[in-house]
Design a protein with these regions (language model features):
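Compositionally biased terminal segments of proteins
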Residues: 2-228
């Protein structure tokens, strides 16, 4: 990724390291913008806080022989749709989460609030969202699609990730049942666009989400055709 630079008052271009010092003198909106730019640069280089938190969590789970699968935006990135995120979504069984907490709470991870599934990495200051096998995406109500067992995970970029089929299925079920999760439908469209997912994937999906996948796929195809 190209080095992100900041134009100084004198018209010269400052590298990001120097830009960090310059932003200390900017007003709050400008400072927030450049802090976000530095965060994005670190993220897309794979050296940011979120990547470090993910790798630290995954290596700990593997050392403890606790099955897991990275989900959410970090899984999207692993499959080829690059977008920034500020947290790590991880799939665990209920027993796996209990085992991890018993060994590691207070040792680099804390609960977000007493008894919460979610945690926070205290070394990287990154939120960890935990998805539990058997729970339901979207509105949380029983439905044909549920969070799978981590055993479905595949190895990708040094960590275990949800396969494309499961990731797409969960995001479609989430977006279809929770109006506050429309971005999950957008994620599916962007993944189709980024890696050219085939229409034939529809046959591997749960019947609950097949129509929506086909609808999004055809809309994305029409959009691409209109550009030429």
């Amino acid at each position: 990724m190209a080095d992100i630079r900041l134009m100084t008052r004198g018209g010269t271009i400052a590298p990001m390291a120097e830009a960090a010092k310059l932003t200390e003198r900017l007003d709050d909106p400008s400072r927030r913008f450049w802090e976000g730019a530095r965060f994005a640069e670190r993220f897309f280089m794979g050296v940011g806080e979120v990547h470090r938190a993910m790798r630290r969590l995954c290596s700990t789970l593997e050392a403890d022989d606790i099955p897991y699968a990275i989900a959410g935006a970090m899984a999207l990135n692993a499959h080829g749709y690059q977008r920034v995120t500020t947290d790590v979504d991880i799939l665990l069984t209920r027993e796996g989460l209990a085992a991890f907490k018993a060994m590691h709470l207070g040792r680099g991870w804390v609960e977000r609030f007493p008894g919460s599934k979610g945690m926070r990495d205290t070394e990287c200051n990154v939120k960890i969202d935990v998805l539990i096998t058997g729970d339901y995406p979207g509105d949380g109500k029983p439905k044909a699609v549920s969070f799978p067992d981590p055993s479905v995970a595949i190895r990708g970029d040094g960590v275990m990730i949800l396969p494309v089929r499961h990731l797409v299925e969960l995001k479609l079920a989430s977006g279809l049942t929770n109006p506050d999760r429309m971005k999950d439908l957008a994620d599916v469209q962007e993944l189709i666009r980024a890696v050219l997912l085939p229409l034939e994937l529809v046959d591997a999906l749960n019947p609950m989400v097949r129509t929506k996948y086909a609808e999004i796929w055809h809309a994305t195809k029409r959009e691409a055709d209109d550009e030429y």
